[in-house]
A protein has these predicted regions:
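Structural detector of well-ordered beta-strand residues that form the stable sheet scaffold
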Residues: 66, 113-115, 150, 321-322
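Histidine-centered divalent metal-coordination motifs
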Residues: 44, 152, 156
Length: 367
């Protein structure tokens, strides 16, 4: 699981290196050039200390912020409504979207797009399992027009992509879907959605649902053997025993010999699972926000595929938001979808304007 986190850090750093030093980022990042296209920037969890200077910079230099529809219209036609326009996006709908970003955007007369995960959002104003906005807060932000609510998948869940078991459900495990390391699946449905996962449940090597890799489905007999073995030996207490996980791996191996093998989902199952997720997230947001037309989708972890893009178009989306680099295999003319590449928010300070920061200083700014 630590290895998965290191992989994500390495992937992020690699993309940033390629973007800057191989000049794959927009020219304004690594030179004094004006932006050729409308720049898009991505935020996640924010603090007032980090966000306020960025919004001040945009406002003082007369930048106009756009909704997702406005961005795609401008980008696809090449006709800008103003000389200086940018797209600000917030992923995951952290609680700070409402408590920090929303009031600051109002103060500076700016707006942003929020890609939310409707299957994770609570209905009440009390805190949920994770520090996310709730539906009353999202309705308020949407109603004012300051925040344009769009889709970030139904559950932001990951899937097992191999038979390799990297861990077991145990005390102290980080269950946050934002962490992404926890990816057990029972047939088509992620067990993460149930709210309860028994100790001993095998955790496989994981990947993003919208990538090319199909989900691996472990034999349920093997899963239940591991769960029952832990439960019969004290549950939580089992993992305090020396060599507990090593013993459980031996149980897993033996059970696999005595049960039919697990399998990967086939192409039809993969396609259906992806399409259902696209449709479900769109419908749920539109149900919660009457009158809202959800047309824009952001890939969790910035990880998608040509199949996913094609299916998102089939589900009614017109754009896909990624990270800073999108595969060269993604072409608007082929996919019929607009691909939005987004830079880390600190690169706002590289936009032309009074108080523009040097690249070396921006690279050390971790907003």
């Amino acid at each position: 699981m630590l290895l998965n986190r290191l992989r994500r850090v390495n992937e992020k750093n690699r993309n940033e290196f390629l973007g800057i030093f191989l000049h794959r980022y927009p020219a304004f990042v690594w030179s004094d050039a004006e932006p050729d296209d409308i720049p898009a920037f991505v935020f996640h969890d924010v603090t007032p200390e980090a966000l306020k200077p960025l919004l001040e910079y945009l406002t003082e230099n007369r930048y106009t912020t756009l909704t997702a529809d406005e961005y795609v219209e401008r980008a696809s036609t090449g006709e800008h409504g103003a000389k200086r326009e940018v797209l600000l996006t917030f992923d995951d709908s952290h609680e700070s979207l409402y408590s920090v970003a929303y009031p600051l955007l109002q103060r500076y007369g700016q707006k942003a797009v929020a890609y939310v995960v409707p299957g994770r959002i609570e209905n009440s104003r009390t805190s949920g399992t994770f520090p996310l906005c709730n539906w009353p807060q999202i309705r308020e932000m949407n109603r004012t027009g300051v925040i344009d609510i769009q889709s970030h998948s139904m559950f932001h869940h990951s899937i097992p992509i191999s038979s390799c078991v990297v861990d077991f459900v145990r005390p102290g495990l980080n269950f946050s879907f934002l962490n992404g390391d926890f990816a057990p699946v029972r047939e088509k449905e992620s067990i993460q959605e149930s709210g309860f996962v028994p100790f001993g449940y095998p955790i496989h090597d994981w990947g993003a649902r919208m990538r090319e890799a199909p989900a691996y489905m472990e034999n349920t007999g093997v899963i239940n053997t591991c769960i029952d073995y832990v439960a019969s030996r004290g549950g939580e207490e089992f993992f305090r025993m020396p060599g507990g996980r090593r013993t459980l791996r031996a149980v897993l191996k033996d059970s696999r010999l005595r049960n039919p093998p697990g399998r990967f989902e086939n192409e039809d199952e993969q396609r259906i699972a992806m399409l259902e997720d696209f449709i479900a997230s769109k419908r749920e947001i539109e149900r919660q926000l009457p009158g809202k037309n959800v047309r824009h989708y952001c890939f969790p972890w910035f990880r998608g595929s040509r199949l996913a893009s094609a299916l998102s178009f089939e589900a009614g989306y017109v754009s896909n938001a990624w990270g800073s680099l999108v595969s060269s295999t993604m072409r608007y003319s082929e996919e019929k979808i607009w691909h939005i590449t987004r830079l880390p928010c600190r690169y706002i300070f590289r936009l032309p304007g009074r108080g523009r920061r040097g690249l070396s200083r921006v690279l050390t700014h971790r907003a």
